[in-house]
C-alpha cells in the first residue's frame, strides 16, 4: 500500500497512517493501550497524532509467559472491538468511511506462535 517502502517497518513512520492500534504488553510489558492514529507527520504532538483512547497497566492486562491467548478483533454494527481471552478490552464506534479494511500484526522483541489464525467476513459466520 502507499508509502510502505518508505515506512520500512520503522515504528515512528506508522504515525503517517490513519488507523487504530492495540499495543498489548507494550513498553517492556508495562502497558496495554488502544490508540487512534490520525495520519500526521513528525513535529506534531504525539497526543494529537496518536491519542491513547484507553490504557491498562495492571498485571491482569499484561503479557504472561507461556500463556496461549485468544484474540478477537471485530468490526461490525458500526464499531470495532478488541477482546482477549473473552474479555472485551476496547470498543470504539467507527464512522462511515473510517478505516479501509486493513489490519496488521506487529511483533517486536517477543517470541510468538500463532495457531488457528482466521480472518472471516462476519456475515458468513452467522
Roles of regions detected by a PLM:
Residues 1-126:
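Extracellular glycan-recognition regions
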